């Protein structure tokens, strides 16, 4: 069933850009991994939109982040407002329309698909099981061989041969 649902994404390869973050909690500490992930996804989505708008100046687009309802709704909306007004560590996110829109995933097939992408990413990074994840790799935002839509937050002292780190030549610190 999961494989069939993810195949729907793969069938629309040219029209879909995925964004995901895998966080090693120990490497992120003392930062909140949810907030760190949210900032990275916002930044990467904003950069994708900026790149797209530069390539297509007559078809400028803004992005809306739609998320599953959770206990993190209020804090993440506050962070999104802060990023638009004062910026994040990456600057202001000028290509996002407003704060994230939170919906019950039971009411949205797109959010259910996003949940499956998150699950596949979690299985890959937590259990080294790429059964679902590997078919998604070509769907992550990518330019010039670098996967921008997938970020792995980890200790730079550890070797890593995941798609995200290899595409940036970040197997080891200094490498």
Task: Give the role of each language-model region.
Residues 1-175:
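Phosphate-ester processing/binding pockets and catalytic centers
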């Amino acid at each position: 069933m999961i494989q069939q649902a993810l195949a729907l994404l793969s069938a629309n390869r040219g029209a879909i850009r995925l964004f995901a973050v895998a966080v090693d909690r120990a490497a992120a500490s003392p930062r909140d991994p949810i907030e760190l992930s949210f900032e990275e996804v916002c930044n990467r989505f904003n950069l994708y939109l900026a790149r797209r708008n530069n390539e297509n100046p007559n078809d400028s687009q803004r992005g809306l982040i739609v998320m599953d309802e959770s206990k993190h709704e209020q804090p993440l909306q506050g962070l999104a407002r802060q990023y638009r007004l004062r910026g994040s560590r990456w600057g202001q996110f000028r290509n996002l329309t407003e704060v994230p829109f939170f919906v019950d995933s039971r009411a949205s097939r797109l959010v259910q698909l996003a949940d499956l992408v998150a699950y596949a990413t979690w299985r890959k990074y937590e259990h080294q099981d790429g059964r679902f994840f590997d078919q998604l790799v070509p769907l992550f935002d990518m330019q010039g061989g670098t996967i921008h839509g997938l970020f792995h937050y980890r200790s730079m002292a550890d070797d890593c041969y995941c798609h995200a780190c290899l595409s940036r030549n970040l197997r080891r610190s200094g490498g």
